Amino acid sequence: MFTMKKSMLLLFFLGTISLSLCEQERNADEEERRDEEVAKMEEIKRGLLSGILGAGKNIVCGLSGLC
């Protein structure tokens, strides 16, 4: 009986460690995905901003005739 309790306790302990490691890995994956999404959004914002600035320069250049 005592040996069975020890082995069950050991299995519980190892299962808890395994679960904890899986949870940490999942959290790291989610954080990595969030970082990738933020990077994509920043790229899109930069692209839109440069497009707007380029169009603004063309308008000013066309209206003033100084280019």
Curated annotation (Swiss-Prot):
Signal peptide positions on this chain: 1-22
Keyword Lyase included in the entry's annotation: no
GO BP, sorted A to Z: defense response to Gram-negative bacterium; defense response to Gram-positive bacterium; hemolysis in another organism
Disulfides per UniProt: 61-67
Tissue and organ expression note: Expressed by the skin glands.
UniProt xrefs under InterPro entries: Frog_antimicrobial_propeptide, Nigrocin
Pro-piece positions: 23-46
GO cellular component terms given for this protein: extracellular region
Subcellular localization, as worded in the UniProt entry: Secreted
Location (main, coarse): secreted
UniProt keyword list: Amphibian defense peptide, Antibiotic, Antimicrobial, Cleavage on pair of basic residues, Disulfide bond, Secreted, Signal
Family (UniProt): Belongs to the frog skin active peptide (FSAP) family. Brevinin subfamily.
Function (record text): Antimicrobial peptide active at least against the Gram-positive bacterium S.aureus but with otherwise unclear activity spectrum. Lacks hemolytic activity against rabbit or human erythrocytes.
Protein name: Nigrocin-2GRc
